[in-house]
């Protein structure tokens, strides 16, 4: 079992968004998944029961920013940052997502931020980062979330260059469980990639960053995500649904095993062309069962894509690449992870990059901007 301690060095990856993304309706919807309602209820109940049993972070009925000591920045984005924070009373550590309201509005991300909060507050699953509470002040929005000390999977993948077949299968199996749960709630994730997959202190997956997640009753037509991981139906603007998550899983499995995504280019336009041309090539060393699954996940016809047909997620679970996976053991975290992050103390940030601290707080916002988050 490999043990790692490193700083993540992720280069910025362009996220693509149509202007209409910011104008999407904020109403909550659900859609009929391929699983029956009884099956969905069983998935949800089992996942939430497991999440509650395994939760180690003390929770409060309410939070106040004054209760938190803000320690250090552990992540930075276009319109916000993530800080490590410590509860002054319990000593528990949290990830504090800090968003500058003016920048959110200027970047036309208002609806995405609302979506992320609404979606995360619904989710209770061992492979999804937990959100505990939200706060705001005159210029910022705050999301108090679970601190995942292992850092990004991206860091470990780049350090290793690629993962073995068994390592890729381990992570893919945990992601399948998370996607099954998310889809059962009528939610599409839309941003699956190594940078959004964190490792817990034990080495298990934690899906993070739900800014592009959306509750969906049928299809949506906006282009949201990262170029390398976009499904062809997203590029064609013919409407997409949960099938984009299964496509992204195929890209992820390929990238884990090869070290780079299957459709590449020097520019975003070239990447799009490669996706549309769909020239899928595998190294000779690529596991045959994994190859078969990736091909079925990267099926251009979304109606024939594995995970999107009558049996839904069960078709993915029943694939021969996963034949040795005990799904109950996977969900209950009884399978030993291939990578265990090196951590020396609670609140250790050694698996994150170093960032310059923000001393300005960013631009001031107007009352009109604040009104967009009146219910925050």
Residue ranges and their predicted role:
Residues 1-62:
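Intrinsically disordered, low-complexity regulatory segments that flank or precede the catalytic domain
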Residues 70-82:
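Protein kinase glycine-rich loop
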Residues 93, 98-124:
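Conserved N-lobe beta3->alphaC-helix segment of eukaryotic protein kinase catalytic domains
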Residues 134:
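Activation-segment/catalytic-loop signature of the eukaryotic protein kinase fold
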Residues 139-152, 156:
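Conserved short submotifs of the Hanks-type protein kinase catalytic core
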Residues 171-172:
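Activation segment signature within eukaryotic-like protein kinase domains
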Residues 303-376:
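C-terminal regulatory tails of eukaryotic serine/threonine kinases
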């Amino acid at each position: 079992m490999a043990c790692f301690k490193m700083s993540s060095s992720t280069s910025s990856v362009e996220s693509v968004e149509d202007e209409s993304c910011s104008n999407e309706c904020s109403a909550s919807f659900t859609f009929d998944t391929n699983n029956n309602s009884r099956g969905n209820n069983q998935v949800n109940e089992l996942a939430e029961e497991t999440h509650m049993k395994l939760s180690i972070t003390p929770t409060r009925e309410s939070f106040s920013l004054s209760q938190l000591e803000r320690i250090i920045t552990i992540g930075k984005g276009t319109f916000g940052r993530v800080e490590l924070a410590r509860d002054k009373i319990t000593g528990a550590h949290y990830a504090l997502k800090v968003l500058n309201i003016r920048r959110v509005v200027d970047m036309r991300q208002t609806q995405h931020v609302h979506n992320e909060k609404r979606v995360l507050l619904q989710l209770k699953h061992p492979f999804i980062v937990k959100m505990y509470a939200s706060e705001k002040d005159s210029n910022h929005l705050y999301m108090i979330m679970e601190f995942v000390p292992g850092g990004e999977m991206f860091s470990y993948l780049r350090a290793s260059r690629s993962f073995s077949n068994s390592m890729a299968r381990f992570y893919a199996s945990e992601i399948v469980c998370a996607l099954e749960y998310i889809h059962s709630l009528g939610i599409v994730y839309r941003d699956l990639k190594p940078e959004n997959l964190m490792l817990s202190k034990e080495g298990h997956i934690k899906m993070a960053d739900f800014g592009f997640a959306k509750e969906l009753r049928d299809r949506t037509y906006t282009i949201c995500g990262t170029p390398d991981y976009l499904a062809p139906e997203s590029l064609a603007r013919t409407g997409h649904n949960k099938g984009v998550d299964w496509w992204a899983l195929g890209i992820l499995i390929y990238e884990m095993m090869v070290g780079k995504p299957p459709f590449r280019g020097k520019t975003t336009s070239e990447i799009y062309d490669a996706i549309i041309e769909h020239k899928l090539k595998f190294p000779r060393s690529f596991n045959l069962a994994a190859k078969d699954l990736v091909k079925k996940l990267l099926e251009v016809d979304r109606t024939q894509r594995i995970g999107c047909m009558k049996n839904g997620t069960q078709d993915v679970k029943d694939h021969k690449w996963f034949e040795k996976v005990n799904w109950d053991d996977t969900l209950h975290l009884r399978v030993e992870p291939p990578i265990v992050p090196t951590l020396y103390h609670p609140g250790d940030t050694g698996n994150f990059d170093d960032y310059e601290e923000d001393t300005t707080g960013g631009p001031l916002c107007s009352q009109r901007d604040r009104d967009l988050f009146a219910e925050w």
